[in-house]
């Protein structure tokens, strides 16, 4: 079956009595150009700087000051974020281990296998999981796991994959990304992540300080990854057609914060979570007696949050999720 043929995808669903589940985000990608864009973005070797950003410390005091002006964020304006942003043309060695969450009918899975990847695909729908095994049966380079990806992430099944490529389900996509990335510092998270998500989610992930759409997810992701919006994908490229458009997003580990200890990471999570829960408040009001600042959460860069986390020290660890 040609998985980029709308008529063939529809015929398979009809003949098998399969009805795409909106709750599970079963909107199947049926556009060859969009598919190739995802695969091309995924199989470019990341350019990782060997330099790392030291954890910034300030004098130990009960109240730490932050200016309203922020230093430039790694995932901000220096990275292309428009639909026509060119990707570097690079010949590279293909990664051997690739994680895919929510493969659906297997259009991405098939493309990854064709390009030489060894794929572990996690599919929640048992009908689609069985179909994937039958249609793309490749015991040497394809493993299909049935169940909830969040459970597999928590039990460590998803650790150790250098590459993750997924058309993430709309309702759970952000949570899946955060759960994967939060394992950095304790376990091995992917060096490169290429995902297809709602455009509004993509914009939040890539937003730099000062942006109205900057939020907790973007700050969390940018702590360890540079973010690039590769291109937009119209709703017409899916069947069934979703209500809104999507975007291909590429995340590459920058390793600048690798020397941030577990306490700093936990404090960072606690600070940012609490700050964005009260995003319209000035930080001085949210953290009375701890931080002196008239800035609001979205106005701080990741470097600012890192400096605060290192200066404040371990606290709030039980609440950082």
Per-range role (PLM):
Residues 1-57, 62, 66, 71-76, ...:
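Catalytic cores of RNA-modifying enzymes
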Residues 272-321:
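C-terminal lobe and adjacent flexible extensions of AdoMet/dcAdoMet transferase-like proteins
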């Amino acid at each position: 079956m040609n998985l980029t043929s709308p008529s063939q995808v529809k015929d398979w669903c009809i003949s098998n009595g399969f009805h795409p589940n909106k709750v599970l985000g079963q909107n199947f990608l049926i556009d060859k150009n969009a598919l190739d864009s995802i695969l091309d973005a995924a199989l470019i070797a990341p350019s990782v700087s060997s330099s790392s950003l030291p954890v910034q410390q300030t004098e130990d005091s009960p109240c730490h000051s932050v200016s309203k002006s922020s230093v430039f964020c790694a995932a901000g304006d220096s990275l292309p974020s428009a639909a026509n942003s060119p990707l570097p043309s690079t010949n590279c060695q293909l990664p051997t281990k690739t994680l895919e969450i929510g493969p659906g009918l297997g259009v991405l899975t098939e493309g990854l296998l064709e390009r030489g990847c060894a794929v572990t695909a996690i599919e929640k729908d048992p009908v689609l999981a069985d179909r994937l095994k039958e249609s793309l049966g490749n015991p040497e380079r394809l493993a299909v796991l049935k169940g909830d990806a969040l459970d597999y992430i928590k039990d460590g099944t998803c650790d150790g994959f250098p590459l993750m490529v997924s058309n993430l389900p709309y309702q759970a996509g952000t949570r899946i990304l955060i759960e994967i990335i939060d394992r950095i510092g304790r376990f091995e998270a992917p060096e490169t992540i290429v995902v297809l998500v709602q455009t509004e989610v993509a914009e939040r992930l890539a937003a730099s300080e000062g942006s109205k759409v900057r939020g907790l997810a973007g700050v969390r992701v940018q702590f360890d990854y540079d973010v690039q919006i590769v291109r937009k994908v119209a709703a017409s490229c899916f069947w069934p057609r979703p209500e809104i458009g999507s975007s291909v997003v590429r995340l590459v580990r920058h390793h600048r914060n690798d020397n941030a200890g577990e306490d700093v990471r936990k404090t960072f999570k606690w600070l940012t979570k609490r700050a964005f829960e009260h995003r319209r408040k000035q930080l001085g009001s949210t953290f009375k007696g701890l931080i002196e600042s008239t800035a609001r959460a979205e106005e701080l860069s990741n470097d600012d949050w890192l400096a605060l986390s290192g200066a404040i020290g371990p606290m709030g660890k039980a609440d950082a999720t």
